[in-house]
Amino acid sequence: MDISKLTDVKKVDLCKKYFLIGACFLPLVWIVNTFWFFSDAFCKPINAHRRQIRKYVIASIVGSIFWIIVLSAWEIFFQHYRAQGLVWTDFLTFVFPTGRV
């Protein structure tokens, strides 16, 4: 999809839709939103529509960073306790070590 051919109003609408879709626990959509609209939000001269795009891009960046931190912390926490051989970690995994099943 070539977003350079869209009008500013349609860009704002598309950026808003991607932000709302990302708010449904889909952080990868926020990352796509950031990459697609970053140049419109920060590299081109500012106007009323680009100000709205900038708002959604900044919110997408903040949301993506939040989810990356949360998922990384969970992975570190889980792997740390799984290496200790605690029983509850086996209930949270789909991949069982050899000899455990």
Curated annotation (Swiss-Prot):
Give GO terms for biological process: cell fate commitment; embryo development ending in birth or egg hatching; embryonic morphogenesis; germ cell development; nematode pharynx development; Notch receptor processing; Notch signaling pathway
Transmembrane ranges, per UniProt, are 18-38, 58-78
**Which Pfam family, an example, fits this chain?**
PEN-2
Where is it chiefly localized? endoplasmic reticulum
GO cellular component terms, semicolon-separated = endoplasmic reticulum membrane; gamma-secretase complex; Golgi membrane; membrane
Localized where? Endoplasmic reticulum membrane; Golgi apparatus membrane
Q: Does the keyword Calcium apply?
A: no
- Report the record's disulfide bonds: none
Tissue-by-tissue expression: Expressed from 100-cell stage in most somatic tissues, including neurons, muscle, intestine and developing vulva. Little or not expressed in early embryos.
Supply the InterPro entries for this chain.
Gamma_Secretase_Asp_P_PEN2 (IPR019379)
Query: Can you tell me which family this protein belongs to?
Result: Belongs to the PEN-2 family.
Q: What does this protein do?
A: Essential subunit of the gamma-secretase complex, an endoprotease complex that catalyzes the intramembrane cleavage of integral membrane proteins such as Notch (glp-1 or lin-12). It may represent a stabilizing cofactor for the presenilin homodimer that promotes the formation of a stable complex.
Q: What is this protein called?
A: Gamma-secretase subunit pen-2
Q: Can you name the source organism?
A: Caenorhabditis elegans
Source taxonomy lineage? Eukaryota, Metazoa, Ecdysozoa, Nematoda, Chromadorea
